Amino acid sequence: MGNITKRGSRDFAADSAVLLEGSLATALHSRLYEAIIKEDCDTIRTLLRNHPVNQPLTLLASSTGYRFLSQQTQPIFPIHLAAEYRKPQSLLCLLQHGADPEVRDAQGLTTLHLMLLNWPVTSTTWTKPSTRIQKILTDIQNNAVLCLRILCDHGAQVNARVDNSNKHSPLHLAITYGTYPVLSFLAQNGAQVNAINESSMTPLHMAADILNKNMIETLIACGANVNCAISSTGNTALKLAVCTASSKAGRLLAAGVGCIRLLLNHGAQVNAQDHEGQTALHEACFGGREVIINLLLEFEANVNILTRNGESPIYMYLQRSSNIRDVTLLARLLYRTYPLRLSNKQGALPAGIMLPEFHLLRETLIKLSKKPLTLEAICKRNIRNVYGEKYKFQLKKLLPAKLWNSIYGIYDFTYLLK
Protein backbone atom coordinates (compact mmCIF):
# COMPACT_ATOMS: atom_id res chain seq x y z
CA MET A 1 0.00 0.00 0.00
CA GLY A 2 2.88 2.34 0.86
CA ASN A 3 4.60 1.54 -2.48
CA ILE A 4 1.44 2.50 -4.35
CA THR A 5 1.27 5.81 -2.49
CA LYS A 6 4.94 6.59 -3.22
CA ARG A 7 4.51 5.70 -6.92
CA GLY A 8 1.44 7.94 -7.11
CA SER A 9 3.36 10.82 -5.57
CA ARG A 10 6.18 10.42 -8.10
CA ASP A 11 3.70 10.35 -11.03
CA PHE A 12 1.98 13.45 -9.71
CA ALA A 13 5.31 15.25 -9.40
CA ALA A 14 6.27 14.23 -12.93
CA ASP A 15 2.93 15.41 -14.31
CA SER A 16 3.32 18.69 -12.47
CA ALA A 17 6.76 19.17 -13.97
CA VAL A 18 5.39 18.53 -17.47
CA LEU A 19 2.56 21.00 -16.90
CA LEU A 20 4.99 23.59 -15.59
CA GLU A 21 7.27 23.09 -18.56
CA GLY A 22 4.30 23.36 -20.92
CA SER A 23 3.06 26.56 -19.32
CA LEU A 24 6.54 28.08 -19.51
CA ALA A 25 6.77 27.16 -23.20
CA THR A 26 3.34 28.65 -23.83
CA ALA A 27 4.34 31.85 -22.08
CA LEU A 28 7.56 32.01 -24.11
CA HIS A 29 5.68 31.47 -27.39
CA SER A 30 3.14 34.12 -26.47
CA ARG A 31 5.82 36.68 -25.55
CA LEU A 32 7.77 36.04 -28.76
CA TYR A 33 4.59 36.27 -30.79
CA GLU A 34 3.72 39.65 -29.29
CA ALA A 35 7.29 40.92 -29.65
CA ILE A 36 7.24 40.10 -33.38
CA ILE A 37 3.90 41.84 -33.88
CA LYS A 38 5.08 44.92 -31.94
CA GLU A 39 8.50 44.86 -33.68
CA ASP A 40 10.22 44.83 -30.28
CA CYS A 41 13.59 43.63 -31.56
CA ASP A 42 15.33 43.77 -28.16
CA THR A 43 12.76 41.36 -26.71
CA ILE A 44 12.95 39.17 -29.82
CA ARG A 45 16.72 38.85 -29.43
CA THR A 46 16.35 38.00 -25.74
CA LEU A 47 13.66 35.37 -26.29
CA LEU A 48 15.56 33.72 -29.14
CA ARG A 49 18.16 32.62 -26.58
CA ASN A 50 15.59 30.13 -25.30
CA HIS A 51 13.57 29.50 -28.46
CA PRO A 52 15.17 28.16 -31.69
CA VAL A 53 14.49 30.69 -34.45
CA ASN A 54 13.27 28.02 -36.88
CA GLN A 55 10.97 26.29 -34.42
CA PRO A 56 7.25 27.10 -34.82
CA LEU A 57 5.22 28.94 -32.23
CA THR A 58 2.13 27.18 -30.91
CA LEU A 59 -0.41 29.37 -29.17
CA LEU A 60 -3.58 28.56 -27.30
CA ALA A 61 -6.79 30.18 -28.48
CA SER A 62 -6.85 32.56 -25.51
CA SER A 63 -3.20 33.53 -25.58
CA THR A 64 -3.44 36.29 -28.17
CA GLY A 65 -6.01 38.35 -29.97
CA TYR A 66 -4.01 38.87 -33.13
CA ARG A 67 -4.95 35.80 -35.14
CA PHE A 68 -8.36 34.53 -36.15
CA LEU A 69 -9.84 31.85 -33.91
CA SER A 70 -9.56 29.24 -36.65
CA GLN A 71 -5.82 29.95 -36.81
CA GLN A 72 -4.92 30.45 -33.17
CA THR A 73 -4.07 26.85 -32.39
CA GLN A 74 -2.08 26.39 -35.60
CA PRO A 75 1.70 26.42 -35.31
CA ILE A 76 3.42 29.24 -37.17
CA PHE A 77 7.10 29.90 -37.75
CA PRO A 78 8.37 33.22 -36.38
CA ILE A 79 9.56 34.35 -39.82
CA HIS A 80 6.16 33.51 -41.35
CA LEU A 81 4.46 35.56 -38.66
CA ALA A 82 6.62 38.60 -39.40
CA ALA A 83 6.01 38.24 -43.15
CA GLU A 84 2.24 37.74 -42.88
CA TYR A 85 1.81 40.82 -40.73
CA ARG A 86 4.35 42.85 -42.75
CA LYS A 87 6.69 43.63 -39.85
CA PRO A 88 9.97 44.58 -41.56
CA GLN A 89 12.04 45.18 -38.41
CA SER A 90 11.00 41.86 -36.90
CA LEU A 91 11.65 40.11 -40.20
CA LEU A 92 15.14 41.57 -40.45
CA CYS A 93 15.91 40.69 -36.83
CA LEU A 94 14.83 37.06 -37.34
CA LEU A 95 16.85 36.72 -40.54
CA GLN A 96 19.93 38.14 -38.82
CA HIS A 97 19.51 35.45 -36.16
CA GLY A 98 19.44 32.63 -38.69
CA ALA A 99 15.77 32.32 -39.67
CA ASP A 100 15.36 30.19 -42.80
CA PRO A 101 13.24 32.04 -45.41
CA GLU A 102 12.62 28.73 -47.22
CA VAL A 103 10.99 26.95 -44.27
CA ARG A 104 7.53 25.74 -45.35
CA ASP A 105 4.25 25.58 -43.50
CA ALA A 106 1.75 22.71 -43.61
CA GLN A 107 0.41 23.98 -46.96
CA GLY A 108 3.85 23.91 -48.57
CA LEU A 109 4.28 27.70 -48.55
CA THR A 110 7.57 29.53 -48.01
CA THR A 111 7.92 32.96 -46.44
CA LEU A 112 7.81 34.62 -49.87
CA HIS A 113 4.67 32.70 -50.83
CA LEU A 114 2.95 33.87 -47.64
CA MET A 115 4.01 37.44 -48.31
CA LEU A 116 2.31 37.33 -51.71
CA LEU A 117 -0.82 35.63 -50.39
CA ASN A 118 -1.17 38.34 -47.75
CA TRP A 119 -0.20 41.28 -49.95
CA PRO A 120 -2.29 44.37 -49.08
CA VAL A 121 -4.88 45.58 -51.56
CA THR A 122 -4.75 49.37 -51.70
CA SER A 123 -6.19 51.98 -54.02
CA THR A 124 -4.08 53.41 -56.81
CA THR A 125 -6.38 56.38 -57.43
CA TRP A 126 -4.54 58.84 -55.20
CA THR A 127 -1.02 60.20 -55.65
CA LYS A 128 -0.58 61.47 -52.09
CA PRO A 129 -2.44 60.12 -49.06
CA SER A 130 -4.87 62.83 -47.96
CA THR A 131 -6.81 61.09 -45.22
CA ARG A 132 -5.81 59.12 -42.16
CA ILE A 133 -7.12 55.88 -43.66
CA GLN A 134 -5.21 56.48 -46.90
CA LYS A 135 -2.04 57.13 -44.91
CA ILE A 136 -2.52 53.89 -42.97
CA LEU A 137 -3.03 51.94 -46.20
CA THR A 138 0.02 53.57 -47.76
CA ASP A 139 2.13 52.64 -44.73
CA ILE A 140 0.88 49.04 -44.97
CA GLN A 141 1.84 48.94 -48.65
CA ASN A 142 5.28 50.42 -47.94
CA ASN A 143 5.88 47.87 -45.18
CA ALA A 144 4.98 45.05 -47.56
CA VAL A 145 7.45 46.33 -50.16
CA LEU A 146 10.16 46.71 -47.51
CA CYS A 147 9.56 43.15 -46.27
CA LEU A 148 9.84 41.86 -49.84
CA ARG A 149 13.14 43.69 -50.32
CA ILE A 150 14.49 42.33 -47.04
CA LEU A 151 13.53 38.78 -48.01
CA CYS A 152 15.17 39.00 -51.43
CA ASP A 153 18.28 40.65 -49.99
CA HIS A 154 18.61 37.67 -47.64
CA GLY A 155 18.43 35.06 -50.36
CA ALA A 156 14.76 34.14 -50.62
CA GLN A 157 14.25 31.77 -53.56
CA VAL A 158 12.15 33.74 -56.05
CA ASN A 159 11.51 30.63 -58.18
CA ALA A 160 10.50 28.24 -55.37
CA ARG A 161 7.24 26.52 -56.22
CA VAL A 162 4.41 25.97 -53.79
CA ASP A 163 4.47 22.36 -52.61
CA ASN A 164 0.91 21.51 -53.64
CA SER A 165 -1.02 20.34 -56.70
CA ASN A 166 -0.74 23.69 -58.52
CA LYS A 167 3.04 24.09 -58.25
CA HIS A 168 2.74 27.88 -58.59
CA SER A 169 5.90 29.96 -58.63
CA PRO A 170 5.95 33.34 -56.84
CA LEU A 171 5.09 35.05 -60.14
CA HIS A 172 2.07 32.76 -60.59
CA LEU A 173 0.96 33.62 -57.05
CA ALA A 174 1.38 37.32 -57.76
CA ILE A 175 -0.95 36.99 -60.77
CA THR A 176 -3.48 34.87 -58.89
CA TYR A 177 -3.73 37.20 -55.91
CA GLY A 178 -3.52 40.45 -57.85
CA THR A 179 -0.19 41.62 -56.45
CA TYR A 180 0.68 43.54 -59.60
CA PRO A 181 3.30 45.85 -58.01
CA VAL A 182 5.67 42.96 -57.23
CA LEU A 183 5.94 41.48 -60.74
CA SER A 184 8.79 43.62 -61.99
CA PHE A 185 10.58 43.44 -58.63
CA LEU A 186 10.51 39.63 -58.65
CA ALA A 187 11.67 39.52 -62.28
CA GLN A 188 14.54 41.91 -61.51
CA ASN A 189 15.57 39.60 -58.67
CA GLY A 190 15.77 36.53 -60.87
CA ALA A 191 12.21 35.21 -61.10
CA GLN A 192 11.79 33.17 -64.29
CA VAL A 193 9.14 35.06 -66.22
CA ASN A 194 8.34 32.05 -68.45
CA ALA A 195 8.16 29.48 -65.64
CA ILE A 196 5.25 27.04 -65.90
CA ASN A 197 3.01 25.64 -63.20
CA GLU A 198 1.51 22.16 -63.00
CA SER A 199 -0.98 23.12 -65.75
CA SER A 200 1.91 24.23 -68.00
CA MET A 201 0.71 27.83 -67.79
CA THR A 202 3.15 30.73 -67.63
CA PRO A 203 2.36 33.88 -65.64
CA LEU A 204 1.49 35.56 -68.96
CA HIS A 205 -1.08 32.86 -69.73
CA MET A 206 -2.72 33.52 -66.37
CA ALA A 207 -2.66 37.31 -66.79
CA ALA A 208 -4.16 37.03 -70.29
CA ASP A 209 -6.83 34.65 -69.05
CA ILE A 210 -8.07 37.26 -66.56
CA LEU A 211 -7.55 40.18 -68.98
CA ASN A 212 -5.23 42.13 -66.68
CA LYS A 213 -3.60 44.62 -69.02
CA ASN A 214 -1.16 46.04 -66.45
CA MET A 215 0.15 42.58 -65.64
CA ILE A 216 0.39 41.61 -69.31
CA GLU A 217 2.32 44.79 -70.09
CA THR A 218 4.71 44.30 -67.16
CA LEU A 219 5.39 40.64 -67.98
CA ILE A 220 6.08 41.44 -71.64
CA ALA A 221 8.45 44.21 -70.58
CA CYS A 222 10.23 41.66 -68.37
CA GLY A 223 10.73 39.28 -71.31
CA ALA A 224 7.65 37.04 -71.31
CA ASN A 225 7.24 34.92 -74.45
CA VAL A 226 3.94 36.02 -75.99
CA ASN A 227 3.78 32.96 -78.24
CA CYS A 228 4.47 30.29 -75.63
CA ALA A 229 1.77 27.59 -75.88
CA ILE A 230 0.32 25.52 -73.06
CA SER A 231 1.59 21.99 -73.69
CA SER A 232 -1.69 20.25 -72.88
CA THR A 233 -3.95 22.41 -75.08
CA GLY A 234 -1.77 24.45 -77.40
CA ASN A 235 -3.44 27.66 -76.22
CA THR A 236 -1.41 30.86 -76.36
CA ALA A 237 -1.91 34.00 -74.30
CA LEU A 238 -3.73 35.55 -77.27
CA LYS A 239 -6.17 32.64 -77.55
CA LEU A 240 -6.89 32.77 -73.80
CA ALA A 241 -7.47 36.53 -73.89
CA VAL A 242 -9.80 36.23 -76.88
CA CYS A 243 -11.72 33.42 -75.19
CA THR A 244 -12.34 35.48 -72.04
CA ALA A 245 -13.08 38.69 -73.96
CA SER A 246 -15.57 36.84 -76.19
CA SER A 247 -17.47 35.34 -73.27
CA LYS A 248 -20.78 36.73 -72.04
CA ALA A 249 -19.04 38.49 -69.17
CA GLY A 250 -16.42 39.95 -71.51
CA ARG A 251 -19.13 41.29 -73.78
CA LEU A 252 -21.17 42.79 -70.91
CA LEU A 253 -18.10 44.45 -69.39
CA ALA A 254 -16.70 45.51 -72.79
CA ALA A 255 -13.42 43.99 -71.61
CA GLY A 256 -10.29 42.69 -73.23
CA VAL A 257 -9.79 44.76 -76.39
CA GLY A 258 -6.79 46.58 -74.94
CA CYS A 259 -5.22 43.31 -73.76
CA ILE A 260 -5.64 41.65 -77.15
CA ARG A 261 -4.25 44.64 -79.03
CA LEU A 262 -1.31 44.78 -76.62
CA LEU A 263 -0.46 41.12 -77.30
CA LEU A 264 -0.81 41.58 -81.06
CA ASN A 265 1.35 44.71 -81.03
CA HIS A 266 4.06 42.72 -79.25
CA GLY A 267 4.20 39.94 -81.81
CA ALA A 268 1.49 37.48 -80.82
CA GLN A 269 0.93 35.16 -83.78
CA VAL A 270 -2.65 35.83 -84.79
CA ASN A 271 -3.01 32.56 -86.73
CA ALA A 272 -1.43 30.22 -84.16
CA GLN A 273 -3.46 27.00 -83.82
CA ASP A 274 -4.11 24.96 -80.70
CA HIS A 275 -4.07 21.16 -80.58
CA GLU A 276 -7.58 21.06 -82.09
CA GLY A 277 -6.53 23.37 -84.90
CA GLN A 278 -8.49 26.35 -83.60
CA THR A 279 -7.14 29.88 -83.93
CA ALA A 280 -8.04 32.98 -81.95
CA LEU A 281 -10.41 33.89 -84.80
CA HIS A 282 -12.31 30.61 -84.38
CA GLU A 283 -12.82 31.50 -80.73
CA ALA A 284 -13.82 35.08 -81.53
CA CYS A 285 -16.27 34.01 -84.23
CA PHE A 286 -17.95 31.55 -81.88
CA GLY A 287 -18.31 34.34 -79.31
CA GLY A 288 -19.59 36.70 -81.99
CA ARG A 289 -18.22 39.89 -80.45
CA GLU A 290 -17.72 42.20 -83.41
CA VAL A 291 -14.97 44.40 -81.99
CA ILE A 292 -12.79 41.36 -81.24
CA ILE A 293 -13.35 39.82 -84.67
CA ASN A 294 -12.55 43.12 -86.38
CA LEU A 295 -9.39 43.54 -84.29
CA LEU A 296 -8.11 40.10 -85.29
CA LEU A 297 -8.95 40.79 -88.94
CA GLU A 298 -7.04 44.07 -88.66
CA PHE A 299 -3.97 42.02 -87.73
CA GLU A 300 -4.47 39.69 -90.72
CA ALA A 301 -6.25 36.78 -89.11
CA ASN A 302 -6.86 34.08 -91.73
CA VAL A 303 -10.57 33.31 -92.14
CA ASN A 304 -9.86 30.17 -94.16
CA ILE A 305 -7.93 28.10 -91.60
CA LEU A 306 -9.69 24.84 -90.74
CA THR A 307 -9.64 22.96 -87.46
CA ARG A 308 -8.74 19.28 -87.30
CA ASN A 309 -12.46 18.62 -87.65
CA GLY A 310 -12.71 20.74 -90.78
CA GLU A 311 -14.40 23.75 -89.19
CA SER A 312 -13.68 27.27 -90.45
CA PRO A 313 -14.13 30.48 -88.45
CA ILE A 314 -17.39 31.17 -90.28
CA TYR A 315 -18.58 27.68 -89.32
CA MET A 316 -18.00 28.63 -85.68
CA TYR A 317 -19.82 31.92 -86.21
CA LEU A 318 -22.86 30.11 -87.63
CA GLN A 319 -23.07 27.81 -84.61
CA ARG A 320 -24.99 30.38 -82.55
CA SER A 321 -28.27 32.01 -83.48
CA SER A 322 -27.33 35.25 -81.73
CA ASN A 323 -24.39 35.63 -84.12
CA ILE A 324 -26.44 34.97 -87.23
CA ARG A 325 -28.71 37.93 -86.53
CA ASP A 326 -25.76 40.28 -87.08
CA VAL A 327 -26.04 40.15 -90.86
CA THR A 328 -23.46 42.87 -91.49
CA LEU A 329 -20.71 41.01 -89.64
CA LEU A 330 -21.69 37.75 -91.33
CA ALA A 331 -21.40 39.47 -94.72
CA ARG A 332 -17.94 40.78 -93.78
CA LEU A 333 -16.78 37.27 -92.92
CA LEU A 334 -18.31 35.81 -96.08
CA TYR A 335 -16.49 38.32 -98.23
CA ARG A 336 -13.17 37.14 -96.82
CA THR A 337 -13.92 33.43 -96.99
CA TYR A 338 -13.05 31.25 -99.97
CA PRO A 339 -13.88 28.51 -100.51
CA LEU A 340 -17.01 28.67 -98.35
CA ARG A 341 -17.13 25.44 -96.33
CA LEU A 342 -20.39 25.08 -94.47
CA SER A 343 -19.93 21.55 -93.14
CA ASN A 344 -17.27 19.85 -91.05
CA LYS A 345 -15.54 16.53 -91.73
CA GLN A 346 -18.62 14.62 -90.60
CA GLY A 347 -20.78 16.57 -93.04
CA ALA A 348 -22.66 18.36 -90.26
CA LEU A 349 -23.86 21.92 -90.81
CA PRO A 350 -23.50 24.57 -88.07
CA ALA A 351 -26.18 24.21 -85.40
CA GLY A 352 -27.36 27.82 -85.70
CA ILE A 353 -28.49 27.67 -89.31
CA MET A 354 -30.33 24.39 -88.67
CA LEU A 355 -32.95 26.28 -86.67
CA PRO A 356 -36.29 26.66 -88.53
CA GLU A 357 -36.16 30.47 -88.37
CA PHE A 358 -32.99 30.45 -90.49
CA HIS A 359 -34.08 28.00 -93.19
CA LEU A 360 -33.97 30.66 -95.94
CA LEU A 361 -30.49 31.75 -94.88
CA ARG A 362 -29.38 28.11 -94.81
CA GLU A 363 -30.54 27.59 -98.39
CA THR A 364 -28.86 30.81 -99.51
CA LEU A 365 -25.55 29.86 -97.93
CA ILE A 366 -25.65 26.35 -99.38
CA LYS A 367 -26.15 27.86 -102.85
CA LEU A 368 -23.27 30.27 -102.29
CA SER A 369 -21.00 27.43 -101.18
CA LYS A 370 -21.71 25.54 -104.39
CA LYS A 371 -21.32 28.54 -106.69
CA PRO A 372 -17.77 28.88 -108.07
CA LEU A 373 -16.32 32.38 -107.96
CA THR A 374 -14.96 34.22 -110.93
CA LEU A 375 -11.24 34.80 -111.17
CA GLU A 376 -11.88 38.50 -110.51
CA ALA A 377 -13.77 37.75 -107.29
CA ILE A 378 -11.03 35.40 -106.09
CA CYS A 379 -8.39 38.06 -106.75
CA LYS A 380 -10.39 40.67 -104.83
CA ARG A 381 -10.71 38.29 -101.89
CA ASN A 382 -6.99 37.64 -101.88
CA ILE A 383 -6.27 41.37 -101.89
CA ARG A 384 -8.63 41.89 -98.95
CA ASN A 385 -7.04 39.04 -97.03
CA VAL A 386 -3.48 40.20 -97.73
CA TYR A 387 -3.98 43.90 -97.02
CA GLY A 388 -6.89 43.55 -94.61
CA GLU A 389 -8.38 46.43 -92.67
CA LYS A 390 -4.99 47.59 -91.47
CA TYR A 391 -3.64 48.69 -94.85
CA LYS A 392 -6.76 49.21 -96.93
CA PHE A 393 -6.58 53.00 -96.80
CA GLN A 394 -2.94 52.95 -97.88
CA LEU A 395 -4.07 50.81 -100.80
CA LYS A 396 -6.77 53.37 -101.57
CA LYS A 397 -4.07 55.91 -102.39
CA LEU A 398 -2.55 53.55 -104.96
CA LEU A 399 -5.64 52.23 -106.75
CA PRO A 400 -8.33 53.93 -108.84
CA ALA A 401 -11.36 54.76 -106.69
CA LYS A 402 -13.69 52.51 -108.69
CA LEU A 403 -11.37 49.51 -108.32
CA TRP A 404 -10.82 50.12 -104.61
CA ASN A 405 -14.55 50.40 -104.00
CA SER A 406 -15.17 47.14 -105.82
CA ILE A 407 -12.56 45.39 -103.66
CA TYR A 408 -13.73 46.73 -100.31
CA GLY A 409 -17.45 46.96 -101.01
CA ILE A 410 -18.06 44.14 -98.53
CA TYR A 411 -21.73 44.64 -97.93
CA ASP A 412 -23.05 43.40 -101.27
CA PHE A 413 -24.08 40.10 -99.66
CA THR A 414 -26.15 41.76 -96.96
CA TYR A 415 -29.37 41.90 -98.92
CA LEU A 416 -29.10 38.17 -99.65
CA LEU A 417 -28.82 37.34 -95.97
CA LYS A 418 -31.81 39.30 -94.68
Curated annotation (Swiss-Prot):
Protein name as annotated: Ankyrin repeat domain-containing protein 61
Q: Kindly state which keywords UniProt assigns to this record, in alphabetical order.
A: ANK repeat, Repeat
Chain ranges passing through the membrane: none
Per-repeat ranges for ANK: 27-57, 74-103, 131-160, 166-195, 199-228, 233-272, 276-305, 309-342
At the top level, the lineage of the source is Eukaryota
**Gene Ontology CC annotation, any one:** nucleoplasm
InterPro entries recorded: Ankyrin_rpt, Ankyrin_rpt-contain_sf
Q: What Gene3D superfamilies is this protein classified in?
A: Ankyrin repeat-containing domain
